[in-house]
């Protein structure tokens, strides 16, 4: 069927849907804009499309299964399907017979598809060449009220459970000048919130003699009223630049939001996960942030049921969480991922994982509500996202009446819910 489309790129309509993290969300937009540049019409309605591109996530087994189900669903609807993102890179054999677009090729999506349609030729994937100009992904970002801003690709970790490293590879940081120039462009064209994103923002620059604190400091000097949310950091890398990081966090343009995954509150499990820090080292980072950054919103991730995790080790995790009281906990049952070291370890019964997940969910709700109650009576700066909703300057969701989209307003918090706040405009 592909040959039917020879020489008719200008008439072709492409539907794109994406899944996964903020970094993948950015890639989905990059794919769309690359397609437009190369003459394709991007449509929002699947029924109108000749081709469907699915930008996949593969972080968990159930996510992988959902992706494969959706791919087959699109195929059965009679669409030509292109599989992009982490799934084809990490588990190529699972999606044989489809055209693939890998994470580091998102900005080349239009060129790849055009070549395939017109010549039935798949451009070779030469990662060394792609890595040299990977920063050109930034050229395909367009402004919106909230805009993801990727700063690097890959990471320097080697966590024993993680398939994303297989999909996204080692660290390639974008030049600071390129990021800052793109941020200026986005803000000048109306962006009010930049989501600074990467697999691990804390390792930014380690490969090019730079670091995240330097980047953030330069970004804060951009003129205009805007706020940045710094994405997930690995604790072992954040620790290396901790003092500089906390200093730049005191700038009003840096949201008081810290996403620092703990994963386990037991040192033996952390060692087997290859996380590279101890529980005490993790606590020290969080406590130092809280000591110097007022109203810090601390978010963390926890994996329950990691291979070999005993009941005592699980209880150790709960105890650490009760002590640190994160504002929000992303809890997940351990997922066995092909090609990872942890997949070869002795696995825990799924019923035990499920029970521990339920216990964690109850605790995370309790802690979230406990934290949110502290804000009742406080006046907070809020970015209005849409009618009746906004982000506080530490990225809690607050509901209120009034305000124009894109404005920064003062809101007094009047009530707290488990995962959000209520308030009223005062300025």
Swiss-Prot record:
Q: What is the reaction catalyzed?
A: N(6)-L-threonylcarbamoyladenosine(37) in tRNA + (sulfur carrier)-SH + AH2 + 2 S-adenosyl-L-methionine = 2-methylsulfanyl-N(6)-L-threonylcarbamoyladenosine(37) in tRNA + (sulfur carrier)-H + 5'-deoxyadenosine + L-methionine + A + S-adenosyl-L-homocysteine + 2 H(+)
- The residues listed in the UniProt record as binding [4Fe-4S] cluster 2, with positions renumbered to this chain, are 155, 159, 162
Gene Ontology annotations of biological process type: tRNA methylthiolation
**E.C. number:** 2.8.4.5
Q: Where is the TRAM domain?
A: 373-427
What residue intervals traverse the membrane? Answer: none
> SUPFAM superfamilies of this UniProt entry?
Radical SAM enzymes (SSF102114)
* Any single Pfam family the record assigns to this protein: TRAM
User: Which amino acid positions bind [4Fe-4S] cluster 1, per UniProt?
Assistant: 21, 57, 86
Molecular-function GO term, any one: 4 iron, 4 sulfur cluster binding
Q: How is the cofactor bound?
A: Binds 2 [4Fe-4S] clusters. One cluster is coordinated with 3 cysteines and an exchangeable S-adenosyl-L-methionine.
Domain Radical SAM core, first and last residues per copy: 141-370
Q: Which cofactor does it need?
A: [4Fe-4S] cluster
Record keywords, A-Z: 4Fe-4S, Iron, Iron-sulfur, Metal-binding, S-adenosyl-L-methionine, Transferase, tRNA processing
Q: Tell me where in this chain the MTTase N-terminal domain is found.
A: 12-118
Enzyme class label: transferase
Family as reported in the entry's similarity comment: Belongs to the methylthiotransferase family. CDKAL1 subfamily.
- Biological function: Catalyzes the methylthiolation of N6-threonylcarbamoyladenosine (t(6)A), leading to the formation of 2-methylthio-N6-threonylcarbamoyladenosine (ms(2)t(6)A) at position 37 in tRNAs that read codons beginning with adenine.
**Stored PANTHER family:** RADICAL SAM PROTEINS, THREONYLCARBAMOYLADENOSINE TRNA METHYLTHIOTRANSFERASE
User: What name has this protein been given in UniProt?
Assistant: Probable threonylcarbamoyladenosine tRNA methylthiotransferase
Species for this entry: Methanocaldococcus jannaschii (strain ATCC 43067 / DSM 2661 / JAL-1 / JCM 10045 / NBRC 100440)
